[in-house]
Amino acid sequence: FTVNIGLIEHGVPVLGVIYAPPQNLLYYGAKKLGAWREKEKGKPEAIHARIPAADGLVVVRSRSHPSKIAEAFLNTLTIKENIPSSSSMKLCLLAEGTADI
């Protein structure tokens, strides 16, 4: 599970925070500050999405809510690895460059 906090100013998102207590991982990003990850007792690390590898995509999938539509779409792609994940962690894995889609 995760705790998610966002700040919107005048209809524009300016800050986002995702904390995963079981892993003690904190992800955050802010306008003009970039995106960051902090592991337990670690210093902040800048994170960024990646360019997919030519040999296939790394896919994060819902652990508890499979979708026939998503499966049909994914079947059209070359997939190198599947990572089951839950809640907002899927978005964090994309943001840190662990997964492609």
Feature map (PLM): residue ranges:
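Acidic beta-strand-loop-alpha-helix segment within the catalytic core
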Residues: N4-C92
